[in-house]
């Protein structure tokens, strides 16, 4: 082989490598290593293993007992092979929506039920139909989860979500369920819905397509602002769980002042106070 031929083949190889890096092949379901959780990496077209899931125990989520029972019952039915609904957890930020999804997954796995959690980021939602199809080829159950799911004006990716939830003529895979959290009950701002009404050939059909997106979820689970006593119950449950020494601290007064300073009472604000309290009392809360 001449030097020119060698250089030509080398150049072709580099071009092929570059094309593959930009357009990686679809993953092989059989090659997916076992794990409790994965995150979809769109750039690499593969599932990335999650070694340590960032979650709290289910019993620490106070003030959302009804929401907890509803989603837990639905999840257990799904994992056991019975009929179950896709779920939309909607409401104010910091009220425990995503924490509940992760805590319930942890609960069912500790009970010996084999189920993996797969997170797909909001910006990758167009890959949801492919992910559903990919997971359908595996002999395992999966909760596919997207946090903070909303669609703004001009964003047409919601159509991919509708297609995935409807499942086409094949239907939704029996071994996959989809949970999403959002601060919008209908996933879209009112202005976007009104804009579709004004530009549609048949205004009622345009609005119906937008609003009906949330109808693809069989469960709508609302999360609302909590009162003062519930907020304090959340704080005290963390204090007890982490065994924080509060002998020199008036936690009720401090926690309320913390919430006033941040202008909100929520599970997230309660946790932020606990992190601050643990630091001041030199309590390790990272390994619990």
PLM feature spans:
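Conserved catalytic/switch belt of AAA+ P-loop NTPases
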Residues: 109-110, 137, 153-200
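Dynamic helix-loop-helix/coil hinge segments at AAA+ ATPase domain boundaries and subdomain interfaces
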Residues: 2-6, 46-70
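AAA+/P-loop NTPase substrate/partner-engagement loops
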Residues: 107-142, 150-154
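Conserved AAA+ ATPase "SRH/arginine-finger" region at the nucleotide-binding site
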Residues: 182, 198-211, 218-230
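Walker A/P-loop nucleotide-binding motif
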Residues: 81-103
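C-terminal alpha-helical "lid" subdomain
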Residues: 2, 25, 224-288
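Interdomain "pre-motor" coupling segment immediately N-terminal to P-loop NTPase/helicase cores
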Residues: 2-49
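Pre-Walker A adenine-sensing motif
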Residues: 66-80
